[in-house]
Amino acid sequence: MDTVLKCLPSNPDDHCSQRCRLGPKAMALIGAKVGFPVLVSLQSGSCLCTAWPRRDLCDGFVQADYMCSTSHKPMAVFKDTGICLNQIKSMASTKLRKVSVKVVVRSLDVKRATSEAALLETVRDLLRNVFVLNDYVLSVNADSPVVHIEILDTDPATSNAGLITGKTSIVIKEVITLEWYKHKLQEAPQLKVAAMDDTCASLKEIIHMPLHYPETMHKLGLPCPKGVLLIGPPGVGKTLLVKAVAREVGAYVIGLSGPAIHGSRPGESEENLRKIFEKAREAACSGPALLFIDEVDALCPKRGHSNSAPENRVVAQLLTLMDGIDSDNKMVTVAATSRPDAIDPALRRPGRFDREVIIGTPTHKQRQAILEMMISNMPTDRDVDAAALADVTVGYVGADLTALCRDAAMQAVLQASLDSLCNLVSRAHFYEAFKRIRPSSARSSIGRVEFKPVHWEHIGGLEDIKHKLRQSIEWPMKYPEAFSRMGLTPPKGVLLYGPPGCAKTTLVKAVATSCHCSFFSISAADLFSPYVGDSEKTLAQVSNRCSDKRGLALQPLFSLMKLMPWWGPDQKVEQDLGSRKGSFLFSLMSWMA
């Protein structure tokens, strides 16, 4: 039984015949009869065939047709390797009364053009006198509109090979296109998303309902959300999050980017946009589909500029396409941006992007979780502590932490090339990487972020001021439930005043360190501008940065207080309220309100 048979290509006449041609000696050894089922088992899967003698009656060879197998692809391993005779086993057969199948057609046009009765008759002809097993896939002739037929269930349920006869009842449970079927069979890499459990759960909840239960929401009279807008700084993991959620809910992802849309001739951009939406609609006819628009602010900027007619047409086309999405269709549009204020406001109304999910800069615990996940895949020394690295990586997003770990590994490789004894990534390698990898927030032109932690013990004296700062800032952030239970409203702002050098800035850094928040330092030169409306715009950007990063923004108030003499006496302040200084003051008060 250890005889090795050489695999040869099947005869052209045996294509889609389910025949496995063997020599007479091999058929006698396995006890197979002509036309009876045999199971060919391999490491990559198995194939169900019928035993037939070779025409030349030569032993030592096998020619198998791969019509019915556990894989949707022909088993290429047969073509260039040999198999042992004990891998071919004769099977008993049972006539089936009923069989449930899933049909894979070539395209959506074929699916729409073929009626249910015609499709059922085609499947019946293809399955007549064919042996099948549960979860096996039949590959059909290339001339047929049906590409694959997957066996879902058989009656009676048996471990023997089931024979489909003319009396067998065939039930088509599902009809999908070939493109969707390939997508479902594609083995995507496992995506690990750390420190975004809450955001992932929120996004999954928004996407899961319209994709999998559109009929239920329609019966309840609730329109399904058509779009979700992800907002967050660059590198925080928006694209990775969308891919992970789509994989979890089983959605087909169609990507869309600005460079792939824009064309050189007039109207080409709108045409490309319509093609992508049509592709997403076709995918949604077979299963849940997710259209992902990355950097939507570059694709759909605000309209109204005289020199942006092509962009205005693209925005108008996108609005029309999103309005045309059927609420019963299993399709959701997800867009990502780091500049929500640059998007045309018409996109952000309900009915287009119904929900907005904000992803902020990782907190201390989130950075620690990200670092632990990355360090677990690296050969690190014992002195590498994720919590200690999280303390000194304030302002780092996921992409920054990935670059930091990669650079530390490169430092270890460089040292290993010089010293063969060094093969682990140590804490010194991470500190060396800190010199090269700066956080994304440090590259902003507005203000700066302080990264070196300052603890309360580093400040001598000032115990009364420390206690008041803890009461005003630290306690509301650490114990919000207690404040809510007692009906206390946390203060919205704190004003520190005093002579230069009395540790005002250091106290704010200590508060930010104890609360694990980012610290922004904005000077008067950053805020004020000679151009009308520029100062208010800068202040709005600072406000958005503080909201995204959950940080403390106390230093801007301190900087502004030093500008009070520049505003002039009290009577001059009243005269300046109509000027840009007064406009800036009103913007500041609106932000603090």
From Swiss-Prot:
Return one Gene Ontology term, BP aspect. ribosomal large subunit biogenesis
Question: Can you say where in the cell this protein is located?
Answer: Cytoplasm; Cytoplasm, Cytoskeleton, Spindle; Nucleus
Extract the PROSITE patterns matched here. AAA (PS00674)
- Identify the residues that bind ATP: 232-239, 498-505
Q: What is its EC number?
A: 3.6.4.10
Q: Which reaction does it catalyse?
A: ATP + H2O = ADP + phosphate + H(+)
Please tell me whether the keyword Nucleotide-binding is annotated for this protein: yes
- One short Pfam name that applies is AAA
- The positions making up the signal sequence are none
Which keywords are on file for this protein?
ATP-binding, Cytoplasm, Cytoskeleton, Hydrolase, Nucleotide-binding, Nucleus, Repeat, Ribosome biogenesis
Tell me which InterPro entries the record gives: AAA+_ATPase, AAA_ATPase_domain, AAA_lid_3, ATPase_AAA_core, ATPase_AAA_CS, P-loop_NTPase
Gene Ontology cellular-component terms listed? cytoplasm; nucleus; spindle
Gene Ontology molecular function: any one? preribosome binding
Q: How is its activity regulated?
A: In the context of 55LCC heterohexameric ATPase complex, the ATPase activity is stimulated by DNA binding and inhibited in presence of RNA.
Q: Which CDD domains match?
A: RecA-like_CDC48_NLV2_r1-like
Question: Which SMART domains does the entry link to?
Answer: AAA
Name of the top EC class for this enzyme: hydrolase
Q: Which PANTHER family match?
A: AAA-FAMILY ATPASE (PTHR23077), ATPASE FAMILY GENE 2 PROTEIN HOMOLOG A (PTHR23077:SF27)
Q: Per its database record, what is this protein's job?
A: ATP-dependent chaperone part of the 55LCC heterohexameric ATPase complex which is chromatin-associated and promotes replisome proteostasis to maintain replication fork progression and genome stability. Required for replication fork progression, sister chromatid cohesion, and chromosome stability. The ATPase activity is specifically enhanced by replication fork DNA and is coupled to cysteine protease-dependent cleavage of replisome substrates in response to replication fork damage.
User: Oligomeric state and partners?
Assistant: Part of the 55LCC heterohexameric ATPase complex. Associates with pre-60S ribosomal particles.
Q: Give the family per the record.
A: Belongs to the AAA ATPase family. AFG2 subfamily.
Q: What is this protein called?
A: ATPase family gene 2 protein homolog B
* Organism field: Xenopus tropicalis
Taxonomic placement: Eukaryota, Metazoa, Chordata, Craniata, Vertebrata
* Gene label: afg2b
